[in-house]
Amino acid sequence: KTEYVTGAEPQKDTGEPHAPAEAAPRNMQSFTCCFAMDYVRGEDHTIEKPREYAFWREFVPAIKPPWPGRLLSWEYGDPISGKPTKLETDPEKGTGLWTYRRIADKALFVEGTYPGDISLVNWPQNDYLLGNLCDVPEKEAAQHIFRAKQLSLSLLYWMQTEARRKFNATVPQIAFEN
């Protein structure tokens, strides 16, 4: 069996100046159920409303530094400064979050290969903050994975139906890639 440590180790063990005084083994980076999506102009790919959409639509993370509002928003807390930061995504212009972890830029392929760019969604808005997968009972881990998937589907649904962008429109053209 391989020995391992999770979370934040105490300063007395590591000598790191920013380490906490006491060990915090449950203090782990959130996990994310990523998904791929593309944008096909003129088509409507709106998914069915996820079961937990109402919860995730209203969810405000209880973290320090504080998150600036709802998780499903184009605003997030910068991880370094903690200051509210605006995010944008414009699949037509290929800017902002749309290019972050983009899988395929249709401009780099023979015309017609892809109807639109394909982007992998691993954004601050779908980081699951309500529990860990490590060192928890299997049933608890499965519940966290289910809820993380609900969060990711809720983010997609929010973008398709409620999210406003600079040009004041939602994007039902965003398609979930199976």
Predicted stretch roles:
Residues K1-N178:
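Flavin (FAD/FMN)-binding glycine-rich loop and adjacent Rossmann-like elements that form
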